[in-house]
Structure formats: C-alpha cells, structure tokens
Amino acid sequence: MPSRVEKGGASKYHQKNAETGKLFARERIAKLVDAGSFVEDAALANNLDADLPADGVVTGTAKVDGRTVCIMANDSTVKAGSWGRRTVEKILRIQETARDLRAPLFYLVDSAGARITDQIEMFPGRRGAGRIFYNQVQLSGQIPQICLLFGPSAAGGAYIPAFCDVVVMVDGNASMYLGSPRMAEMVIGEKVTLEEMGGAKMHCSVSGCGDVLCKTEDDAIAWARRYLGYLPERTGEPPPDAPAKAPKSSGKRIEEIVPADENKSFDMMAVIHEIVDEGSWCEIKQLFAREILTGFARIEGKVVGVVANQPKWLGGVLFVDSADKAARFIWLCDAFEIPLLYLADVPGFMIGTKVERQGIIRAGAKMIAAVSEATVPKISVVVRKAYGAGLYAMCGPAFEPDACLALGSASIAVMGPQAAVNAVYYNKIQEVPAGPERDAYVAKLRDEYRADIDLMKLAAELVIDAVVPGDRLRGELAARFARFAAKDERRLKKKHIVPPV
C-alpha cells in the first residue's frame, strides 16, 4: 500500500485532530482490534486523486478478543471524512461482508456527511448512500452493530448511529444532527451552539440517541470491546460465558437495603450489586431516563440483561422516555438471545396532561409490546411494589415470565393503599370529622386493603411462583435461568407486530 494512503490527509488536519484529543482513523482501528489482525479492503479507492487517500474511509476485517469483526472508519483528515461515491461503495461492501460472515460490524464515525460535489454519484441511486441505511436495517437483529462516534455525524449521515444497536459518544467531540447550527439559523432563525444542537452530553442525557458518554477516545474503544464480550457473534447463538465471580457485597442484606416503607427511596443499584458477579455490570443509557436502569451483567458467569426500576430517581415512575429506553433494551436482548431479569419497584406510569400530550399511552404500549414479544428466558422479581400497568411493563405474571418471584415485603395491586383508599372511600372519608377520628378511619381502611393484597394470598393463588429471601435471590435466579436456558421459543407465524411507536 502506498505510504500516502496510510498517512491519510494533510499533516495540518492530523495536527488539528491531535489538538482536540482525536486520534487518526487507523490509530483508532489499531486500538480497537487485536494486534496485527486488521486486513484492509479497497485501500486504493480513488487513488488517482492525491487528495483523497482511500476516499476518506478505512474498511476491513479484524479480530477483537479472537472474534472476527468488520470495521468501517471515517478518516476525518480527508475532506473531513465526507462521503464520495467510492466511500459509499466501500461502506456498502463491508456491510455485505459482515452479512456474509455474520460478524459484528463496528462503525467508527467522524464525518461531515455527503460531498455536495459528488451528490449525483453517491446520493440517489440504488448503490447510493441510502443503501447504507437499508443495509443497517436488514442487518439489525442479525449481527451486532456498534457505533463509536468520535466526531460529527451530520445530516443524513446521522442515521448511521441511529440504526446501530449502541452508540458510544466522546464528550466534547462527538455530535450528530440533521441540520448544523449555521443551517438552523439560516432556515428557521434559531441561534444555537453545536453542543446544544447535537452534542454528546445532550444526546446521551436528553434525546436518548446516545447510549454511553465517554471522556476520551481510549475510554470509548475500551467500552466497545467490553460491550462486545456480552454479545454472541450472531443471532441464534448463546452469549459467551465468563468465569463466575461472587458479588461485591455491601455487607447489608437486601432486606436492609430496601426500606419497608414504600414511600422511601433507595438505590436499586445496591440490590443489583448484591445479585450479579462483581465487575460485570455494564450499563446502557445511564444518563437518560434515569428512573429505569438497563444494562448487561453476569450471574454465575452467565450473561443477563437487567431492566430495573430506580426509586432513587422520580420514585421509579415510568415516563415516556423510560418506557422507550426499556423497550429498546428488551428488543436488543431478545434479538441476541440474552435472558432478561426484571427488578420491579414501580408505582406505575406517570399521569397528567404533560405526559398524555407526549404520548405516555403509546410509549407504555411500546414497552409492554417489547415485554410481550421477548421469547428469551425471563424472570421478574417484585423487589418492593408493582402497581397498575407498571406490573405489566415489568413482565408481570400475565406476560409469561418463566418465573415471577417476590421478596417478602413485596406488594402487587392495581394501586397502593393510600391511593386506593382515597379513590374508593373519598366521600365516606369526608363524612368523618377531620382530626384523630378521620385519621383512625383512614388507617383502618388502609390496613384492610393491605390484608386484601397480602403477598401470601397472591402466592396461594399462584400469582407469585416463590417468595424468596434476599440472601437466596442470586442462587434462585442462577438455578432458574439455567433451567430455562434451553426452552423452546414460541412465536405466532407472522411478519411482525404493528408496533405502537
């Protein structure tokens, strides 16, 4: 390969990247893959033009922890990583290679978008830029598609990260947007900064388009390598095992972590760390919709996907964003044969005009649809409470969990005692003189309601499969997941659901 191709663009562009903490595309690949394993394709694309080495994109195959992967990396030192006709063709070919090898595909994105000068050749045709997104959709759920966003992903190019399974963004450098701040000011009169329009922090905490926010490119690459370790190479295969590790216990029993008073908050992460192998928690969308937790972990070395309400944030109530976050994660796990563990402490879905106008019913239906569609092994645990449609969204008994477990203090009902008593007995309560007499009457009604939804009664009616002490929960989960690892998938024959999106 000519040295000028390996060097990429002019030295001034390399210097500019270095000043902002950005690596050269080939350096990124070298850090991502196993040493000496990268085999490049079409390095001489557009080689007759000295200003366009490799036509601004590096593609090829490699190994990551011994596993074959495919890679596309924009070279921002060449025309800002923009796309020409051969750029697009190279991306299409590596997608087709990933399809044929059934290998994970990494997109290392740092691109200003389409070259306007090449638009007729690269934009509208059957092998034009749109085919990239078509291919991504066809590959979705077949092979892992991982985006590391190191710089801009502008205009139509923003759909590359959008169609990936996970998007890792580098703070301060990564951005994605359909229209730049300059275009927004020209077209709609909005003055906005790049960070406000499409920066990494915004997308990882507000829009949800980003999944993981990293400080440096090295951090992003390390996270992506770790993430791949939880996934099978392709759909239909089990995720890889790892040596089992004991949990990193806080020294507290789960019953001590979870307050008996359902109105007191606690950190569900403390419960998760009592259950999963030490160091195995890999959170996705940590900064977005923080009232629900989603991430991979291991129990006795086996991969599970965890969906857990987080009472520490907004009481664990489900909102539009949290329902969207959970639904996407559930679909990801189901696509790649990753068993699902639901940890419920949910008062229900949020109510009010604001969320109704945002589409809370639609979003809730989406989450419940994802729960209903999943055919991987799935276990739900009622940690403290599961009220109303929150029970449905957290894979309650009607949604065919392989087991529905509960801690001893758990409560399942249409609504909590306080809300239920006020809803049913409001008029009678008002007839009782305010003061100690009314307080005693309300307390009596609440006690009667609690007796009606007693956990042992639910277990007697086969609503709950087992009431498990906290110190036995990890072992119970490990045994049950092992039992259902080989279960048959049952799906009605159809093309797909009509999703409530």
Language-model-detected regions and their locations in the chain:
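Ligand-binding clefts of soluble mixed alpha/beta catalytic domains
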Residues: 1-501
